[in-house]
Amino acid sequence: MSTKPLILLLANSKNSINRKFAKALEQQLNAELIELVDYQVDFYCEDLEKDHFPEKIKSLVRKLHDHKTLIFVTPEHNGFVPAFAKNTIDWMTRDTQYGKNQFLKELDGIICCVTPAAKSGGKTVLELLTKFFSFSGLNVKGAVLVNGYHDGFDFQPFITDVQKLI
């Protein structure tokens, strides 16, 4: 198991401010970065699951378990995670390699959200993901809200916050 943190980017926009933050974390923390958009699959449906469980989801869950610490970086879309990310997470919950609904079992995690708004759904996203990921076996070490983002924004204080949680 790698001691190098694994960053999971839950944004699918090429110009996402969350991508910028994830890349800054990757460099400063000497972490590995994967983008959930690379693991997109069909919209979850029980019928699809019975016919063929996506191998790329099984592979992704195994990759998560190659690391002790996960750092989730997500935008907020109307107070929730992006739809494509929610779908991929739904599929991951159906993978029983580590127990029913335990795809994050025995892993440590930090959840981050970057938003341009001073007051936003970012806090709600962090609360929801903290509860959900805890239910899925993750030991949530903390959450970092980066709000009020603008051009020229300094991520360093927030990177330091993440470092303290690792």
Swiss-Prot record:
Q: Which residues bind ATP?
A: 117-124
Q: What is the lineage of its organism?
A: Bacteria, Bacillati, Mycoplasmatota, Mycoplasmoidales, Mycoplasmoidaceae
Its source organism is Mycoplasma pneumoniae (strain ATCC 29342 / M129 / Subtype 1) (Mycoplasmoides pneumoniae)
Record-linked InterPro entries: Flavoprotein-like_sf, FMN_Rdtase-like_dom, NAD(P)H-dep_reductase
Q: What UniProt keywords apply to this chain's record, in alphabetical order?
A: ATP-binding, Nucleotide-binding
Q: What is this protein called?
A: Uncharacterized protein MG342 homolog
Q: Can you name a GO cellular component term?
A: cytosol
The UniProt GO MF terms for this protein read:
ATP binding; FMN binding; oxidoreductase activity
